[in-house]
Amino acid sequence: FLVTLSGFALMGLFAGSIHPGLRVLEILWIKQRDFIGMATAAGSGSLMPVAELHPDAWSFAQQAPHALYMTFFSPLTAYANGALGVMSAVENIAIIVLVSLLIRWRKPWAEVDKPLLYFCLSFCLLLALVIGWTTPVIGALVRYRVPLLPFLLLAFMCFADPKRIPWPQWARTNPLPK
C-alpha cells in the first residue's frame, strides 16, 4: 500500500516535467499566497499566522507538521471567534474524546481491517496536508476539513471492538439475559 501511495505521490510531483500546468507544488504555493492575500484584504478575524511556502519539496516538507497541526488542532483555539468558533472547538473535543474511548475499547491488531485503515489514514493525511498548507483562515479550514472527518472516524472505528463497548440496553442488538 505504501509503495503504491508513494508511487502516485512521486508521479504527482514530477507531472510538471511532462506538462507545465501540472506543477502541483507551485499550484499549492499560489493557492496559499492568494488565500493569505484575500484574507488580509478582507480583514479576516480568524487569520492564523503561517510561514509562507515556496514551490519546492523541502519547503512543503518543513511545513508538513504545522499543516497537520492547523488542520487537526487549530479549531481548538477558535473558541474566541464567536459561536461558530465555540462549535468547532466542541467538535474537536468530541472527536478527541471519541478517539480516546475507541482506543480504550480496541480490538487486537490481527482483527483490524488493515486495507480500510490504511486507505482512511492516507486519505486523511493527504487531505489534511493540502488543507493545512493552503488555508490560513480557521473558518475556511473548519469547512474544508469536513470531507476528512468521516474517514478519520472510520479509521479509528477500525480499531473499536463492538463487543467491548458498553452499549446502553436500548442500543443492544442482542439484549443481555435478565
Describe each PLM feature range.
Residues 1-91:
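Alpha-helical transmembrane segments and terminal signal-anchor/GPI-anchor hydrophobic tails
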Residues 11-18, 100-110, 157-164:
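Structural signal for the C-terminal ends of transmembrane alpha-helices
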Residues 22-24, 138-142, 162-171:
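A cytosolic-side transmembrane-helix exit/cap motif
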Residues 66, 88-97, 101, 126:
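Alpha-helical transmembrane segments of multi-pass integral membrane proteins
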Residues 85-86, 100-122:
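Membrane-interface helix-loop-helix junctions at transmembrane boundaries of multi-pass membrane enzymes
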Residues 125-140:
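Transmembrane-helix signature of polytopic, lipid-linked glycan biosynthesis machinery
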Residues 139-160:
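Hydrophobic/aromatic-rich transmembrane helices and adjacent perimembrane loops
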Residues 154-178:
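A juxtamembrane structural motif centered on a specific transmembrane helix
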